[in-house]
Amino acid sequence: MKISNNSLGFLPTTFILVGIPGLESEHLWISVPFSLIYIIIFLGNGIILHVIRTDIALHQPMYLFLAMLALAEVRVSASTLPTVLGIFLFGNTEISLEACLFPDVLHPFFIHDGASCAAGHVFGPLYSHLQPTELHSYPDTAQGLWHRSYYRTEKHYAHGSVAHSLMASALLWPQCPLTFLLSAPQSYLSCGNISVNNIYGIFIVTSTFGLDSLLIVISYGLILHTVLGIATGEGRKKALNTCGSHVCAVLAYYVPMIGLSIVHRLGHRVSPLLQAMMANAYLFFPPVVNPIVYSIKTKEIHGAIVRMLLEKRRRV
């Protein structure tokens, strides 16, 4: 690690990303499954986006939120692609201080964006069940709410107070047992006062994931109450199947997120290998699983994909 001396104190100019601890000699082979994961992410979410864009029947609130979710997942994966493949495929383990601080702002912004889309996606079937006659006004309302929340989140991250406080705290962290840098371990290893970082982090998590979790629980409670009131067994089965795919999507976001938070709270007791595996699951599990879940569980998406493939086959 190279250290420079400036007005902020002693600052490291480069960090070393270990990747997966204990498997440094196998990084070339490890790059193969990671490359396949990225192919699945971009291909799967790209197909979802293409199908929703081209099929007019899918231009409905529920599928528009699904498109937002897929787009957010593509952005998260694209932001980690250079670092991850750089480590495993090319052995480029050094990262500059600027490149280290940049994901601290970028990754939470994209991931919070995706989690908010997942929460908003729940309100599509809820609103259509409770107000079926007013469904035509829902896309405009949803779009306005999404843009306002997007703007506020962007405004929080654009001020850059957290990144500046990290630099002012003079980080001394020569090695990171992950394929990317997380703000939690960075803050613990800083040499200055990190109270602002901790308060800001708690506020962001509470106002995004905490609020999303509460709204999701309330929404599914109302959906379940509505579904149980459906007279026909076929309609009940269809509604429960749709809700099941939504639950899988939400769990794909929140389970790795909660697991990684617990691991980092107990970081001094947990092996670096487990931390690395949890961190990678946190980044890669939702983008990989969600396209598979929706292409299988959602009948409309599945049918649109089949029609697209059959049309491509006839053209060939």
Curated annotation (Swiss-Prot):
Q: Which SUPFAM superfamilies match?
A: Family A G protein-coupled receptor-like
User: Carbohydrate attachment sites?
Assistant: 5
Q: What is its main location?
A: membrane
Instruction: Recite the UniProt keywords alphabetically.
Output: Cell membrane, Disulfide bond, G-protein coupled receptor, Glycoprotein, Membrane, Olfaction, Receptor, Sensory transduction, Transducer, Transmembrane, Transmembrane helix
Residues spanning the membrane:
32-52, 64-84, 105-125, 162-182, 192-212, 243-263, 276-296
**One Pfam family linked to the record:** 7tm_4
Task: Work out whether the entry's keyword set contains Nuclease.
Answer: no
Q: Which organism is it from?
A: Homo sapiens
Provide the protein name.
Answer: Olfactory receptor 51J1
Q: Give the family per the record.
A: Belongs to the G-protein coupled receptor 1 family.
Gene encoding it? OR51J1
Residue spans, topological domain Extracellular:
1-31, 85-104, 183-191, 264-275
Molecular function in Gene Ontology: G protein-coupled receptor activity; olfactory receptor activity
Residues on the membrane's Cytoplasmic side span 53-63, 126-161, 213-242, 297-316
